[in-house]
């Protein structure tokens, strides 16, 4: 590190959604901020699905926006398709959702952080906190560099002792292809704090050219799209279509027969999963009476050849995933992206 920032008011650990909002919030309050991230280029990177908002989450994005946050603006500037969910119900449960270009979203947020005065971005891994008289006064990086500050905000997300499960295979990582953060959890536990583990899943990414699009149904956004941010004035986003398909009995049988190979059912994973995003194996098990489940094929960026399989979040072995998806009409010859 060429220069260690000084006179920092607020130091934020982690450059995901929460870390970005915390850093910018401190800046709006006139504080000098420092964002420590393991990879400067990954600030604002969307780990999972290429979307902002949705049921429950959409309301949160709006609330963040009212408080001056950047997420709504970033979504409005990178959106490929906008839709209000639950429109058939009362307005209190209407939920805004945007399909976004992951690359444009990341670039927008990265530029916002790097071009804001009084914010310093430091590339490094925080392994412990510095304490003085039971008060946090700074952090220590893995390379032993110390950064002093008035306050520390931890927004490490899935990276704290991150562990990826693919069937019986376990990979230590924050997200696929990126190392997890190790050492900080152990330090916090040594202070008497209790650690727990949450579980989230992600579906395989499909190669667009291996899909038979003629067997899918086009799903467009709203004809009169609504922006997330009240600060967005001019708003004429594209309406890039997604596509829907449905699982079937054969797909369900393939998954059901391999449930014991899913960490959720083998006992390897005991964490609580997100309520509004159950895994495909959980849906097959809990709703055995259902003959089909909807899957949404979503582009990860404009003209993307990498397709996100919304509705097929899973931790099953890769071969089982591929076999189950190839049982679905339109995906008979599907191939996975391996990056």
Enumerate the predicted regions with their spans.
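A glycine-rich dinucleotide-binding beta-alpha-beta segment and adjacent secondary-structure elements
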Residues: 308-339
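Beta1/beta-strand and adjacent pyrophosphate-binding region of the FAD-binding site
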Residues: 4-18
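Core beta-strand elements of the Rossmann-like FAD/NAD(P) dinucleotide-binding domain
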Residues: 8, 142-151
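Long, low-complexity segments enriched in small/aliphatic residues
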Residues: 217-301
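Flexible, glycine/charged-enriched surface loops at secondary-structure junctions
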Residues: 198, 265-272, 331-339
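Glycine-/small-residue-rich beta->alpha transition segments that form the dinucleotide
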Residues: 151, 156-160, 316, 329
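Conserved beta-strand-loop-beta-strand element in the redox core of flavoprotein oxidoreductases
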Residues: 130-146
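Conserved N-terminal/central alpha/beta ligand/cofactor-binding core
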Residues: 6-7, 24-128, 155-172, 179-185, ...
């Amino acid at each position: 590190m060429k220069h260690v920032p000084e006179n920092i008011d607020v130091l934020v650990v982690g450059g995901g959604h929460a870390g970005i909002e915390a850093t910018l919030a401190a800046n709006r309050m006139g504080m000098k901020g420092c964002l420590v991230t393991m990879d400067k280029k990954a600030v604002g990177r969307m780990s999972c699905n290429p979307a902002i908002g949705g049921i429950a989450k959409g309301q949160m994005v709006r609330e963040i926006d009212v408080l001056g946050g950047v997420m709504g603006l970033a979504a409005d500037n990178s959106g490929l398709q906008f839709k209000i969910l639950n429109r058939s119900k009362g307005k209190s449960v209407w939920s805004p959702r945007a399909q976004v270009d992951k690359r444009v979203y990341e670039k927008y947020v990265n530029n916002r952080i790097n071009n804001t005065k009084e914010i310093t971005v430091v590339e490094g891994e925080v392994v412990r906190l510095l304490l003085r008289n039971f008060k946090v006064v700074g952090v220590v990086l893995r390379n032993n560099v110390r950064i002093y500050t008035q306050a520390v905000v931890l927004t490490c997300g899935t990276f704290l002792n991150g562990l990826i499960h693919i069937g019986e295979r376990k990979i230590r990582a924050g997200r696929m292809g990126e190392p997890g953060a190790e050492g900080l959890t152990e330090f916090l536990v040594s202070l008497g704090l209790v650690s727990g583990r949450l579980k989230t899943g992600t579906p395989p990414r499909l190669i667009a050219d291996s899909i038979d699009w003629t067997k899918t149904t086009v799903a467009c956004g709203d004809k009169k799209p609504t922006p997330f941010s009240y600060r967005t004035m001019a708003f004429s986003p594209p309406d890039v279509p997604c596509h829907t398909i449905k699982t079937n009995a054969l797909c369900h049988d393939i998954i059901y027969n391999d449930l014991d190979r899913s960490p959720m059912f083998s006992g390897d994973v005991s964490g609580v999963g997100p309520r509004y995003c159950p895994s495909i194996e959980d849906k097959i098990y809990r709703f055995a009476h259902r003959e089909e489940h909807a899957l949404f094929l979503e582009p990860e960026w404009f003209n993307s050849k990498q397709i996100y399989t919304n509705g097929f979040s899973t931790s099953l072995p890769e071969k089982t995933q591929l076999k189950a998806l190839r049982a679905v009409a339109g995906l008979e010859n599907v191939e996975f992206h391996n990056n």
